[in-house]
Curated annotation (Swiss-Prot):
EC number: 2.7.13.3, 2.7.9.4
Function: Acts as an overall regulator of starch mobilization. Required for starch degradation, suggesting that the phosphate content of starch regulates its degradability. More active on alpha-1,6 branched amylopectin.
PANTHER family listed in its UniProt record: ALPHA-GLUCAN WATER DIKINASE 1, CHLOROPLASTIC (PTHR46999:SF1), ALPHA-GLUCAN WATER DIKINASE 1, CHLOROPLASTIC-RELATED (PTHR46999)
Keyword entries, A-Z: ATP-binding, Carbohydrate metabolism, Chloroplast, Kinase, Magnesium, Metal-binding, Nucleotide-binding, Plastid, Transferase, Transit peptide
Tissue: Expressed in leaves.
Designated name of the protein: Alpha-glucan water dikinase, chloroplastic
Domain notes: The N-terminal domain contains the alpha-glucan binding site, the central domain the pyrophosphate/phosphate carrier histidine, and the C-terminal domain the ATP binding site.
pH dependence: Optimum pH is 7.
Native organism: Solanum tuberosum
Length: 1464
């Protein structure tokens, strides 16, 4: 029952003997005037009211229009003063204030009403209440609550009274039959006081009449409807099976109670189905009775009404209304004299009866809930190690030994000076045929050569249109030629001159007439004709193909040799689908050998085919069974590859989605046979049907599925040709395409009315036959193939029997039946759950060999696709949904994506994160929105990473092959984008965009994160990546809007502000540089604001940061100039470096660290030793001091390296910055002097550190390489340009190396003891990541956990953001060599972070599962760790007496500090 409608009727029951004339729903939220209401208070209404569902039997008495009042249609907050209630209690509340409570027991249904009225009370009263269930003492909080009700501390409900004159009134509706009583207090907000019942709660008992007979029988269909209505009222919750059963029995009990109170089964049926004839007034007699119109006719008429209305998704109550309206329409027809038999013949012709039965089955009121199985999503993880694309390419670029003809072609091309327009090599018998076309001085030169041993004659002609045979002019015939009817014949001659090493037969033809476009030919060997796989050879004279090769580039990043093979065979493939599928099958072995890029090439080719970018049929007739057999062969090979090469499963699924299933001969043959039967049975043997029949016989294709659907839609629309063309055009078939078929379709359909039923039936069956061949991933077809079906033969038409796939899980078929029945539901949540459950059940079968594996794969692909379309259809359902529902949808779509892709570990951990966020929200955790925002950010990163993978893998192949094949450029430009859009990733991205602003608002995050709060004025410049402009010098003050900022970049000269949607850490290198350089830096989370800023490119903006926002406005040149002058006045003096000298030692211990020997990093860590609290650990350190690099370089063993570096340094000084990379590479060639090895070993062992050489010479070599990498980082681009920017002499920069033992960290952190974003020195700001700190300070995507902590309350850290970094770095016990330059000591220059710190061993990248991380899941653990980090920072700040920038790690709960420096 509709609550709003039901309560409007309830309002009418509270009035005196008046009723509103109009019957429409009343929705204004105002409360009616009191004149009507007061009359009700004084005396009980004489009006007899009998409530029956949504209708009310009343005696109408009209009132003047001006006295009508609009009452609120809110479901619960209703005015109540009916004194006719069964139970009434009065309470004195002091003074002249009284409370009256009336309880109205259920008269029908299961709703009790409790009315409250306070007389002479305050204006602001609230009912503070809860329900007490039978056998319980604690309050429960019913789901049915009046408007304005709020939950108070999860313990009570608080509902405002409605003021009416001097009274305050309120009604509660109680549907839960388990509730025995209502307990409450009244809160007087105006006087801030509680009104109690003698110091305790008020308690009002509900009245429940006893059932007269315990075994009252209720028809099951009525119990089902009542159960459904209860479930709907309670918010369509996802009940477990035991709760579902309990609810079903509760519905039965409600109906039994109703019968016990005197209601008949007929009354109940009428109430539930809204057909109570007693609900009509005497003024409106009801003519239609249920007995007049049989149910099946009413259902058929309702179906017709529903179809005409556009098949809307009616709620159950509307469906019943429609059924009764249909019954009423038919009754009117009967009254006009039409008989029931005539009605039946008119309505149930054609397929209407079958459709009605199917529709009614799908729309039944049965409670169809699903309890999904509990699963650990970790089982979804697919991790495969496939060869990197670069390595595969290197293998592919190692060409096999050239054949004789290819070697000849290479040498011949080098001899030809003229531009080569076309080059083709054809396979012929046991050899090859080369054709080269060149252009010279207006003449076309054709050179042919073959390595066949027997004498060969060329049988040839010329063409003015492709494929045409015209006899060549006699003037151009080579010696020995003869002229025939439409051709010439010329013998090949042995090639014995030209200095070519390969001896072949060759022939040259020179064509002077520029009107010819190509040359068709065949070869003649004795009496044998040699053709191009059954067709004529043809070579074009156009330069287009050569230009295409140039546009295609060199094929880098592709399986080039395979793509070239595909391009060479395309002329053959375009003859028919049989040819294309057989060629593809022949190439699967080559693709397997080429690996990931090979299958990418096949996917690109098949995708071009599926999107009609390639010709489907050209001058060739083929039987449908031959096409289906070729498909069958190809899909068998793809199925086998799916089993044997699991690392390529994602690409193989995508290939299969572009190819129909195919099948044994009978399946394809039925396409040919069945169309004949359709024509014969329905008398439609000419016109369009005959033309389509010819096309089907000679070259059926996926277009035929669309044509069949267009015919069905045309017939259903009562033969509207507009509908026919609409279906065709929406699916890419135009009139021109119909005419382009070898067997063209010229005519439009033209059927008679009496053909309608039979054609709908037969074409519906035919559609299944077409889809069985062409639409392997069609849902209905895929389900039928897995569950099995049988189609009987008829006359010459063969029968088809498909057996069910064995080993399907228990209950799996029920899931599929549900999916088919509900696939078009508008409310998609339950459908999505069933689809995902079906995919989860199917997954284990896909991971093991099965002779019907491809049927299971096509089913899985179809289920995957259906999830996407269902989600897109369900967007409307989410328009007003709460964030929890959007998060649930996100989790379903993410699960679907994880089921479809490889290397999905990050996606699976995102999925676990969403489930945790939902759990936090449902559990009342205040941090749920903050945590969900981090999961959302990580999910976006995962999607971006997946999109980048697709682009890297597929786009080069698409561009190379597409350029050669002449595919439209627009199709190439969006190739990867369209691949992504075809999957769940696009739907997921859309859902994330819906949720993001909601989470930001809930978590009070705003639209900005201010990283460097500096006011700035400048010209707006928009760039894709900060990295691409980091070395630029902007002459004018510039505000950069950069789409991508990773965190490691430099901010270019002249930039005064940097705005990005990216999320670098607040403590990343670029963030620190921005604050030090007084550059405004902020992340903008609002896409609308970002778009507005981008649209202002070229204009001058003033940016004014606040703690949580940036206010921007356009300004003029004068304001810009005044701002620039101010900046220039504040520019600091030039910085200077002092060159350090070698101090005589290759290695020193921590107690020898001085400013002449090492940088601030080493000195600070030595200073902390013994001074910090015992709870803070300091790692043992030694160092290679300043000057050691220069000393090593000057050693005799490194003379060659020194000379090479000298040359490169000169090159660099002349402005050739490419020398930087060469210098770094050359530094790595240094050899270690024996004395260095000796001293370093002694110092490390003397300090208690392990000596790498003890594990073998190889380990020392690893350590030595790490040391050299630190030295070489002096010449990394970022550092070099940074020193130039502040005019530091780069030659004076010296590099010491701090050597520390690595602590295998659980977490790493960076602390700024003054909040860098706000400048607040009373609070500490810190960021924490899993594993080593490189993910925090380096260019690793995502955000760290961030928090602040007041120094006066170090026990109360406040989390600002949860982590979204997908990767953590972990390492075994090892040694790290840290850069320690003299550039880090300069005040006003942030030299820290510019140079590399290199561990001896490589870190392991681990995808992080935050759902099992105690820092996230355990609040007490988090509070302890964060407090300890803050304490360590505070202690070090106090030790130095100034703000500090501190790095450290956490291991087994203990804090270690690895370095500190003054905070810039």
């Amino acid at each position: 029952m509709s609550n709003s409608l039901g309560n409007n009727l309830l309002y009418q029951g509270f009035l005196t003997s008046t009723v509103l004339e109009h019957k429409s729903r009343i929705s204004p939220p105002c409360v009616g005037g009191n004149s009507l209401f007061q009359q009700q208070v004084i005396s009980k209404s004489p009006l007899s009211t009998e409530f029956r569902g949504n209708r009310l039997k009343v005696q109408k008495k009209k009132i003047p229009m001006e006295k009508k009042r609009a009452f609120s249609s809110s479901p619960h907050a209703v005015l109540t003063t009916d004194t006719s209630s069964e139970l009434a209690e009065k309470f004195s509340l002091g003074g002249n204030i009284e409370l009256q409570v009336d309880v109205r027991p259920p008269t029908s249904g299961d709703v009790s009403f409790v009315d409250f009225q306070v007389t002479n009370g305050s204006d602001k009263l609230f009912l503070h209440w809860g329900a007490v269930k039978f056998g319980k003492e604690t309050w429960s909080l019913p789901n049915d609550r009046p408007d304005g009700t709020k939950v108070y501390k999860n313990k009570a409900l608080r509902t405002p009274f409605v003021k009416s004159g001097s009274n305050s009134i309120l009604r509660l509706e109680i549907r839960d039959t388990a509730i025995e009583a209502i307990e409450f207090l009244i809160y007087d907000e105006a006087h801030d006081k509680w009104i109690k019942n003698n110091g305790g709660n008020f308690r009002v008992k509900l009245s429940r009449k006893e059932i007269r007979g315990p075994d009252v029988s209720v028809p099951e269909e009525l119990v089902q409807i009542q159960s459904y209505l209860r479930w709907e009222r309670k918010g369509k919750q996802n009940y477990p099976p035991e709760k579902e059963k309990e609810e079903y029995e509760a519905a039965r009990t409600v109906l039994q109670e109703e019968i016990a109170r005197g209601a008949s089964i007929q009354d109940i049926r009428a109430r539930l189905t809204k057909t109570n004839d007693k609900s009509q007034s005497k003024e409106e007699p009801l003519h239609v009775t249920k007995s007049d119109i049989p149910d099946d006719l009413a259902q058929a008429q309702a179906y017709i009404r529903w179809e005409k209305a556009g098949k809307p998704n009616y709620p159950p109550e509307k469906q019943i209304e429609e059924l009764e309206e249909a019954r009423r329409e038919l009754q009117l027809e009967l009254e006009k004299g039409i008989t029931l038999d005539e009605l039946r013949k008119t309505i149930t012709k054609g397929e209407i009866k079958t459709k009605v039965e199917k529709h009614l089955k799908r729309s039944s009121f049965a409670v169809e809930r699903i309890q999904r199985k509990k699963r650990d999503f970790g089982h979804l993880i697919n991790k495969y190690t496939s060869s990197p694309a670069v390595q595969v390419q290197k293998v592919l670029e190692e060409p096999p030994a050239l054949s004789k003809i290819k070697l000849y072609a290479k040498e011949k091309e080098e001899q030809i000076d003229d531009p080569i327009l076309n080059k083709k090599i054809f396979k012929v018998d046991d050899g090859e045929l080369l054709v080269l076309v060149a252009k010279s001085s207006g003449k076309t030169k054709v050179h042919l050569a073959t390595d066949l041993n027997q004498p060969i004659t060329l049988h040839w002609a010329l063409s003015k249109s492709p494929g045409e045979w015209m006899v060549p002019p006699s003037s151009i015939l080579p010696p020995g030629s003869i002229i025939l009817d439409k051709a010439a014949e010329t013998p090949f001659s042995a090639s014995s001159s030209d200095g070519l090493t390969s001896k072949v037969q060759s022939l040259d033809i020179v064509i002077e007439d520029g009107n010819f476009v190509g040359m068709p030919f065949v070869l003649l060997s004795g009496e044998k004709w040699i053709k191009n796989q059954g067709s004529d050879f043809y070579v074009g004279f156009s330069a287009a193909s050569k230009l295409a090769l140039k546009a295609a580039g060199d094929g880098s990043g592709t399986a080039k040799s395979l793509l070239d093979k595909i391009a060479d065979m395309e002329s053959e493939a375009q003859k028919s689908f049989m040819h294309r599928f057989n060629i593809a099958a022949d190439l699967i072995e080559d693709a397997t050998s080429a690996g990931e890029l090979g299958f990418a090439g096949i996917l690109v080719w098949m995708r071009f085919m599926a999107t009609r970018q390639l010709i489907w049929n050209k001058n060739y007739n083929v039987k449908p069974r031959e096409i289906s057999k070729a498909q069958d062969r190809l899909t068998d090979l793809l199925q086998n590859a799916f089993t044997s090469h699991p690392q390529y499963r994602e690409i193989l699924r995508m290939i299969m989605s572009t190819v129909g299933r195919g099948g044994e001969g009978d399946v394809g043959q039925r396409i040919r046979d069945e169309i004949l039967v359709i024509q014969r049975n329905n008398d439609c043997k000419g016109g369009m049907m005959q033309e389509w029949h010819q096309k089907l016989h000679n070259n059926t294709s996926p277009d035929d599925v669309v044509i069949c659907q267009a015919l069905i839609d045309y017939i259903k629309s009562d033969f509207d040709l507009g509908v026919y063309w609409k279906t065709l055009n929406e699916n890419g078939i135009t009139k021109e395409r119909l005419l382009s078929y070898d067997r063209a379709i010229h005519s439009e359909p033209n059927f008679r009315g009496d053909q309608k039923g039979g054609l709908l039936r037969d074409l519906g069956h035919y559609m299944r036959t077409l889809k069985a061949v062409h639409s392997g991933a069609d849902l209905e077809s895929a389900i039928a193939n897995c569950m099995g079906y049988k189609t009987e033969g008829e006359g010459f038409m063969v029968g088809v029997q498909i057996n069910p796939v064995s080993g399907l899980p228990s209950g799996f078929q029920d899931l599929l039946h549900f999916v088919l029945d509900h696939v078009e539901d508008k409310n998609v949540e339950t459908l999505l759950e069933r689809l995902l459950e079906a995919r989860e059940e199917l997954r284990p079968l896909l991971l093991k060999p099965n002779n019907r594996l491809k049927d299971l794969l096509f089913l899985d692909i179809a289920l995957d696709s259906t999830v996407r379309t269902a989600v897109e259809r369900g967007y409307e359902e989410l328009n007003n949904a709460n964030p929890e529902k959007i998060m649930y949808f996100i989790s379903l779509v993410l699960e679907n994506l994880a089921l479809s892709v490889d290397d999905n570990e990050d996606l699976v951990y995102c999925l676990k994160g969403w489930n945790q966020a939902l759990s936090m929200s449902n559990g009342g955790d205040n941090h749920w929105a903050l945590f969900a925002k981090a999961v959302l950010d990580r999910t976006r990163l995962a999607l971006a990473s997946k999109a980048e993978w697709y682009h890297h893998l597929l786009q080069p192949s698409a561009e190379y092959l597409g350029s050669i094949l002449g595919v439209d450029q627009w199709a190439l430009n969006i190739f990867t984008e369209e691949i992504i859009r075809a999957g769940s990733a696009a739907s997921l991205s859309s859902l994330l965009n819906r949720l993001d602003p909601v989470l930001r608002k809930t978590a009070n995050l705003g639209s900005w994160q201010i990283i460097s709060p500096v006011e700035a004025v400048g010209y707006v410049v928009v760039v894709d990546e900060l990295l691409s402009v980091q070395n630029e010098i902007y002459e004018k003050p510039t505000i950069l809007v950069a789409k991508s900022v990773k965190g490691e970049e430099e901010i270019p000269d002249g930039a005064v502000a940097l705005i990005t949607p990216d999320m670098p850490d607040v403590l990343s290198h670029v963030s620190v540089r921005a604050r030090n350089g007084k550059v405004c830096f902020a992340t903008c989370f609002d896409p609308n604001i970002l778009a507005d800023l981008q649209a202002k490119e070229g204009r001058i903006l003033l940016l004014k940061p606040t703690p949580s926002d940036i206010i921007y406005s356009e300004v003029n040149e004068i304001e810009l100039q005044s701002s620039s002058n101010l900046v220039e006045a504040e520019t600091s003096a030039t910085l200077r470096l002092v060159k350090k000298q070698f101090g005589g030692c290759y290695a020193i211990s921590a107690d020898e660290f001085t400013s002449e020997m090492v940088g601030a990093k080493s000195r600070n860590i030595a200073y902390l030793k013994g001074k910090v609290p015992s709870s803070v650990g300091i790692p043992t350190s030694v160092a290679l001091p300043f000057g050691v690099f220069e000393k090593v370089l000057s050693d005799d063993i490194n003379q060659g390296v020194a000379k090479e570096l000298q040359i490169l340094m000169k090159k660099l000084s002349e402005g050739d910055f490419s020398a930087l990379g060469e210098i770094r590479t050359t530094v790595l060639d240094l050899s270690a002097p024996a004395q260095l090895v000796k001293e370093l070993k002694e110092k490390m062992q003397g300090s208690g550190m392990p000596w790498p050489g003890d594990e073998g010479p190889k380990r020392w070599e690893q350590a030595w390489m790490a040391i050299k990498k630190v030295w070489a980082s002096k010449w990394n681009e970022r550092a070099y340009f940074s020193t130039r920017k502040v005019k530091l002499d780069h030659d004076y920069l010296c590099m010491a190396v701090l050597v520390q033992e690595i602590i295998n960290a659980d977490y790493a952190f960076v602390i700024h003891t003054t909040n860098p974003s706000s400048g607040d020195d009373s609070e500490i700001y810190a960021e924490v990541v899993r594993g080593l700190g490189e993910t925090l300070v380096g260019a690793y995507p995502g955000r760290a956990l961030s928090f602040i902590c007041k120094k006066k309350d170090l026990n109360s850290p406040q989390v600002l953001g949860y982590p979204s970094k997908p990767i953590g770095l972990f390492i075994k016990r090892s040694i790290i060599f840290r850069s320690d330059s003299n550039g880090e000591d300069l005040e006003g220059y942030a030299g820290a972070g510019l140079y590399d710190s290199v561990p001896m061993d490589e870190e392991e990248k681990v995808v992080i599962d935050y759902s099992s991380d105690p820092l996230i899941t355990d609040g007490n653990f988090r509070q302890t760790i964060l407090s300890n980090i803050a304490r360590a920072g505070h202690a070090i700040e106090e030790l130095y007496g100034s703000p500090q920038d501190i790095e450290g790690v956490v291991r087994d709960g203990k804090i270690y500090v690895v370095q500190t420096r003054p905070q810039m």
